[in-house]
Amino acid sequence: PVEGTPMDFRCPTAIGVRINQNFEQLKNGNGIDHNWILNTKGDIQQVCATLESSVTGIVLDVYTDEPGIQVYCGNFLDGTLTGKKNTIYNFRASVCLETQKYPDTPNKADWPTAVLRPGEKYESRCIYKFSVHK
């Protein structure tokens, strides 16, 4: 459960407001690097996560048929990596949304399995929809 913790992003909240709070899970990941269980029940028609820039108005809506989403905020970037046009990737200069199964499923018998056996086919859908909010 996330209610009452800095991990509760069910209502729009700036990530930066919560990322440094005194909370064990944030300390363990040096910030946000966690998996959230989605309440969309695999319905790809439902938005499972939204990011919006208050500066540019760019909005990212994520849709998936997966049961979870990993959110990572560049907690281990240190300025040694560069990207396009020599952009330096500094500490927490990014956010990544990765739709996936629950990461600890091999250790939880009552969770849906993430094991893929020989001959089985794996399919997953994820949509990243960008727009601009003015």
Predicted regions and their residues:
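Active-site pocket scaffolds in enzymes
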Residues: 2-134
